[in-house]
C-alpha cells in the first residue's frame, strides 16, 4: 500500500464488494480516513492551520503467523498454497473469536451467513494469473501485490503504518 497515492476514493473497496457480491454486508477491504489538526488565528489576525488528512486502505494482511488462525477453535481458518489465509465456511461455527483476536479486524461476522467472512486474496484470480480485484481496480495504483521480499526491497517501502498495530504481532 502506497499511502502517498491513496486519495480515499474507495474504488478498491467497491471493486471488492462488487466482485464478491457483498451487498451491504461486511466489506473485505475498507478505506479509513484519519484527520485532525486545528485552525488558529495568529497575532496579525490571519488564520493558520496544522490540519492533516490521510487514508489507509486495509484488508486481511494474510499474515505470516495469523493470530486469527491460532485462535480459531473450529479449525475453519487455514493458509493455502499461495499463502492466503482463508475461512472454510462449512467448518466455521460463527463464534467470532478469530475476529476478536485479529489486530487488524480483518475477519468479519456476517449476519446473513452466520459465519466469519474475510478477504481471500482473490485466490481464484491469482490462480488464473491475475491480481486481486482491489489492486487492479485502484486508479491511483496505491495497492500492490506480489512476493513480499520483492515488495520489501522497494525504496519507499514502509514496514508499519502509524495508526495500525505493530506487525511483529503476526510475524513471530
What positions do the PLM features span?
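Non-ligating segments of multi-cofactor redox enzymes
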Residues: 1-172
Amino acid at each position: 500500500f502506497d499511502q502517498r497515492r491513496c486519495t480515499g476514493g474507495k474504488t478498491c473497496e467497491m471493486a471488492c464488494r462488487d466482485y464478491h457480491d457483498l451487498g451491504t454486508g461486511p466489506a473485505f477491504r475498507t478505506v479509513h480516513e484519519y484527520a485532525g489538526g486545528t485552525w488558529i488565528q495568529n497575532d496579525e489576525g490571519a488564520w493558520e492551520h496544522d490540519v492533516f488528512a490521510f487514508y489507509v486502505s486495509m484488508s486481511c494482511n494474510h499474515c505470516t503467523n495469523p493470530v486469527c488462525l491460532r485462535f480459531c477453535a473450529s479449525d475453519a481458518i487455514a493458509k493455502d498454497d499461495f499463502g492466503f489465509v482463508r475461512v472454510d465456511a462449512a467448518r466455521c461455527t460463527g463464534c467470532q473469536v478469530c475476529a476478536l483476536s485479529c489486530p487488524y479486524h480483518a475477519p468479519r461476522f456476517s449476519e446473513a451467513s452466520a459465519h466469519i467472512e474475510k478477504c481471500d486474496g482473490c485466490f481464484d484470480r491469482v490462480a488464473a494469473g491475475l491480481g486481486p480485484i482491489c489492486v487492479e481496480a485502484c486508479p491511483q495504483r496505491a495497492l500492490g501485490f506480489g512476493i513480499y521480499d520483492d515488495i520489501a526491497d522497494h525504496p519507499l517501502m514502509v514496514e508499519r503504518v502509524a495508526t495500525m498495530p505493530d506487525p511483529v504481532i503476526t510475524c513471530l
